[in-house]
Structures are given as structure tokens and as C-alpha cells.
Amino acid sequence: MKFMVIVKATKNGEAGKLPSKEVQAAMGKYNEELTKAGVFLALERLQPSSRGARVKFAGNTRTVTDGPFTESKELVGGFWLWKCDSMEEAIGWLKHAPFEDAEVEIRQVHEAEDFGENFTGELREQEERVRATVEARA
């Protein structure tokens, strides 16, 4: 199973303040542990929302709003993608993360089988082609 581990943005992150050398070293060690255990698949940190944009879809209308998104109470600051056997395993790994003050959400990623008969063989082949192309770029 794959899980997205979503780290909520902090005031410091939204202000563009980067973590200290010590915090980065602790997180680097943690990421190495995840990698050695075969859990770690991907990790990305996000720029502050002031450098982002939102696009709202309503029928054929597209409305773009530039950041920052100060009205939002929960912004994403970054994420991991993990491979674990269960939600409990993912939570267990997360409990060992070297965060001092953070809120983190874990969500299971849909697998192809979750979509049932609507995910036809043709759609499955299309997704496999797209994934193969993306992986070749990495």
C-alpha cells in the first residue's frame, strides 16, 4: 500500500524561514532510516503559499487566485510518499519523525483495483504508459 504523508505548513514555513542545520540533519537521518526500511518512495518540500496560485473550476470557468492564502487554516508544507503494509505501520513510522511542532496527515493512495470495473483495460494501459514515461524521466 502507498501512503501520502502530508505535512501541514507552519508559520515559519509560510514566512520563508528554512529549518536549522540541526533540524535538517535530524530529518536527513530519519529519511535514511525510511529508505533502508524500504518505506521511502518520494519527498518534496513546498515553497510558501505566497509563491503559489489556486485555480478554481466552475463549469467552463477557470478563476486564478495568486497566493498567499492567508484565509486558509490548513496549508500543505510538504509531503512524503511511503510504501507500508498498513496504516498502522505508517503511523508507527510517523511517530518517530523528528518534529517538534507539527501537524501531519496520513492518507492511503488509491490503487487501480479501487476503481473497479470503471477502470477498464484500456484506461489501465494508458495509466501504465504515463507512469512508465514519468519514471523514465526521474
Stretch-by-stretch model annotation:
Residues M1-A138:
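Conserved, structured core segments of small domains
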